[in-house]
Amino acid sequence: TNAHCSAPGCSPSRNALLYGVEPYKSGLYAFYDQDKFSKSQLEDYTSLPEFFKNNGYATFGSGKIHHRRNPTPVEWTEFYDHKAEKRNPMLFDDSGYRQGNSSKMNFKPTLNPLEDHNDYKNASFGTEILSREHAKPFFLAVGIVKPHLAFVAPKQFFDLYPDPVKPPRIRVKDHEDIPAVGRAMAKLKDDKRFKSDGAWNEVRRAYLACISWADHNVGRLIGALKASPYADNTVVVLWSDHGYSLGEKNHFRKFALWEETTRVPFIIWDTRDQNTKEARVIDDGVSLINIYKTLADLSGLKTPDYVDGFSLAPQMLDPSKPFTKPAICSWGRGNYTVRDKDWRYTRYYNGGEELYHHLNDSDEWTNLSANPKYAAHKKRLASYLPVGEVPMVKKGIETWSIPVSADKPLTNKKKTTPESTKNN
């Protein structure tokens, strides 16, 4: 796809999508424990499930929807919280890899039955909701956690990848034309550790296993929908909160403004459209911020005035229809990237820039920002950058540092400088 998140991190991406407001307008740039917010910080926003509940829908949820927010009756008619259950310990196979002593850095198959895994339970709740008879319209959100770290999944999904995983194309000196802020985001320490341990293959294999495990559970949900009375009267949206780098640009995880970290899977399936035999593909840069207005539009509802983005319903019928604006993604205040059909332009808080022409450079190896030949493209894309931006919301923030933000560095146990950031 050419779809992109609003921020390459779980919390800010989900906040933007679920509240319908870009980080540079809400101040929710980073990771937050929402249950510690004062009400005034969120009272101006109506979350997507709350919006549908206010409009007469029954709302059901399970798994990871918000990042670190406990389910509330304001949003949910019913929410399945697997964390409240007693969990069986994961039994790991001897194969795979573990980095250090952190449980989050496990890249291993488990020997537990499928039913022991939280994602299986999350999907099972969704299939049960689809089997019910509903008296009124309903909104169902199922948050499949994998492929989030740790990369652990049932062994049968690791067995799908017995051979060495083909590595991505990597340029050794790729960072030479990248501004210092971008290099700080890259967090080269993970890449160096995996290389020194000879572990990159196991890391990538574990990621693929987790993807297949997620696909399995999504398939269970789709199967339940097709077997239900709602098979031809439901809008299905598949999305992920951010992309993931597995060595591209010598980078691991997300938390950067490059293609692999901002690009996401994104599918909208309107089962009411019985005339469409083949999928329609939108080539323009699409932002997840548009989900709120799109779902409201397809449901015949009007969104709150503050909601950002635009409805994709016209483009779903005709992908050639022009877009209002390309996808914009931010990571920390003052750091933005703009992605349209063929180009990516990035500007950091201190003026550092990157420009890539994806028709010729899908790996983003050659930064064209200093080349006067491409000044017009840079100027056009820069015109979409925010004119104003609000400061970071400070209260309730976790111990987390956005690399080289325009705001003062957040308090950390370790000192944060413009050339360094805490490794997460």
Each predicted region: which residue ranges?
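Short arginine-rich
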Residues: 390-392
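Formylglycine-dependent sulfatase
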Residues: 1-348, 353, 362-386, 397, ...
